[in-house]
Amino acid sequence: MSKIASIGNYWDDRTIGQVVDLLQEYQDLFPTKFEDMKGILGDLGVMRIPLKEGAKPVKQRPYRLNPIYKEKVRKELDKMLAAGIIEPVEESEWVSPMVVQDKKTKGEIRICVDLRKLNDDFVHDPFPTPFTDEVLDNVGGQEVYSFTDGFSGYHQIRIHEEDRYKTTFAIEWGSFQYTVMPFGLRNAPAIFSRVVIVVFKEFIHKFLEVYFDDWTVFGLMNKHVGALRLMLVKCREHQISLNLKKCIFCVPSWYIVGTCGVQTRINGGPC
C-alpha cells in the first residue's frame, strides 16, 4: 500500500495485519487529491438551491482585493479550476463577492464567497445537525476507536447544473460558479448531515457515530475490523471518499470534535 495509514500499535501483529489488509482492499476510497475524488453517487450527492417565493436575484460588487493576495488568489483559482471545484461563467443573475482567508499553514490562503444575500433567500432545510454532547456520550467507554474523515467533505456533493449560477462570484479576472457544495451556503450542514445519516443509518449508535465529516467506529477489538469493513463497504457503495491523512485506526483512546476521552469515561485529560 503506497499510502501511509496511522494505525495504533496496541494490538498483536495479526490484528494489525488484518487492518492493513482491509485498508489495502479499500484503498480506492482514499484519494490523495481532489481530481481523484469521484463524488457521492446518485441524487443523494446532488444539491439543489430552492429560493423563497418572490426572491429577486442580487448582483454585488466585488470586495477590494488586497494587492498582497493577488498572485496567491490567481494560483488558488487555477487549482480550483483544474480540480473542477469551480468553472468559468460568462453571465449570472446572482453574483456574490469573494473573500480571502489565511490558512493556519503559513503562506496559504482559502478562497470563500460571501453568500449572505443568497442565504437570505435560500429556502431553509430543517434537517437536524448532530449535537456534540450526544455524540460524545455515545462514543465514551469503548475498548477501541477508529476515526475517519471525509475527503473535502462538502465538495463531495455536487450542485445541480440548473442551480450553479446562484453561487457565482466575480473578480477582476472573470466570473466563476461552484460545481460542488461550497462552505458558507446556508443549508450545507443540513444537506451533508442528511447524506451521512442516510448512508450510515443502520450502523449509527451501534458501532458508529457521525459528526458532519468526522465518523468514529468504536466497540470491542475482536469485532472492530468487521465494523470497519461494514463502514467501508457503505462508502464504496455510495462513492464516498476518505482522507487517509486525517484517519487514525484502532486506538484505545479517542479525540473527537476537540474533546479528549479515555476508554472508560469522558474527561478533559490527555488522550
Question: What are these regions, as identified by a protein language model?
Answer:
Residues 1-271:
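Retroelement reverse transcriptase polymerase core
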